[in-house]
UniProtKB/Swiss-Prot annotation:
It comes from Ruegeria pomeroyi (strain ATCC 700808 / DSM 15171 / DSS-3) (Silicibacter pomeroyi). One of its GO terms (biological process) is glycerophospholipid metabolic process. This is Glycerol-3-phosphate dehydrogenase [NAD(P)+]. Keywords: Cytoplasm, Lipid biosynthesis, Lipid metabolism, NAD, NADP, Nucleotide-binding, Oxidoreductase, Phospholipid biosynthesis, Phospholipid metabolism. The active site is at K185 (proton acceptor). Catalyzes the reduction of the glycolytic intermediate dihydroxyacetone phosphate (DHAP) to sn-glycerol 3-phosphate (G3P), the key precursor for phospholipid synthesis. The gene is gpsA.
Length: 320
């Protein structure tokens, strides 16, 4: 089975680099000039400078060429996934689609698996998620991810196809749990970053991380996810990484909020849109998610970090 990665950002490029260690891989960029530069210089200077592209990796802006491959990894931001699927529906028809994004669509409240099912019904789909940074994958550092697929046979095939020497995949059929874990941790990471940025200390971050994880479990259970999925790589594992590293864009965005510093809005911060989607879901479902709701308000500028923390600390006392 042949592989193409659609999306030449940092994560898409990193996946393509890793997979090219096993055989030919196509990386598609929607920008012809970027594709030409990457193909000629053998480097993604903009997103992953200093990391060479293997000889087995072909970069192209020709979507028809890329979609001749059997398995397509969709490395696009969550809020742009539906548009890409709709725009290129004919080219994607009949292919196996693996979403490589994390988040909840703002307008619909759906995750990547549901968006793919709604946009391209009948398509065989999966989700690649878990604790990882593009630089680590591209450098060949040991990384473990979750491959979520409702079809066990397809899941086994994809697990074997996409596992590399240093990228190990664990599979699950719980696509709901894997989707929610990868999405919700970004919201909590913004809160943890804001906490540290405002100088509130590691103890406060530990409290936010732990109580945030309780919110993740609460919503996931209500949506039908299995508890063990949230305890795995796509939930707790991703949460721990994202809430503690400056390499996380969501955590860095929170740091900037806490320090009252500007942040590059051109940088994709999935947790912002997800926080607003989660706040709406919480209202619709009548579920208590105070940290996620507060992060949404904080990202809007409705609160300062100090005001947000006071609001959380002044909530009614309860059992853990």
């Amino acid at each position: 089975m042949s592989i193409a990665v659609l999306g030449s950002g940092a994560f898409g490029t990193a996946l393509a680099i890793s997979l090219a260690g096993k055989g030919p891989v196509t990386l598609w960029s929607r920008a012809p000039e970027q594709a030409r530069q990457m193909q000629e210089t053998r480097e993604n200077h903009q997103r992953l400078p200093g990391l060479p592209l293997p000889a087995a990796l072909n970069v192209t802006a020709d979507l028809d060429q890329a979609t001749r491959c059997d398995t397509l990894l969709l490395a696009v931001p969550m809020q742009k996934l539906r548009g890409m699927l709709s725009e290129h529906a004919a080219a994607l028809h009949g292919r196996v689609l693996v979403a490589c994004c994390k988040g909840i669509e703002l307008n619909s409240g759906l995750g990547p698996m549901a968006v793919m099912a709604e946009t391209l019904p009948g398509t065989r789909t999966a989700l690649l998620t878990g604790p990882s940074f593009a630089q680590d994958i591209a450098r060949g550092l040991p990384t473990a991810l979750t491959l979520a697929c409702a079809d066990p046979d397809l899941g086994r095939d994809l697990q074997a196809q996409l596992t590399t020497t240093n990228l190990r995949l664990y599979r699950t059929t719980d696509t709901i749990g894997a989707e929610l874990g990868g999405a919700l941790k970004n919201v909590i990471a913004i809160g943890c970053g804001a906490c540290i940025g405002a100088g509130m200390g590691d103890s406060a971050r530990a409290a936010l991380l732990t109580r945030g994880f309780a919110e993740m479990q609460r919503l996931a259970a209500l949506k039908g996810a299995r508890p063990e999925t949230l305890m795995g790589l796509s939930g707790l594992g991703d949460l721990m990484l994202t809430c503690s590293s400056d390499l996380s864009r969501n955590y860095r965005f929170g740091l900037a909020l806490g320090r009252q510093e500007p942040f590059d809005r051109a940088t994709t911060v999935e947790g912002v849109a997800t926080a607003h989607a989660v706040a709406q879901l919480a209202r619709d479902l009548g579920i208590d998610m105070p940290i996620s709701t507060t992060v949404a308000q904080l990202s809007n500028g409705d609160y300062s970090v100090a005001e947000a923390m006071r609001s959380l600390l002044n909530r009614p006392l309860k059992e853990e």
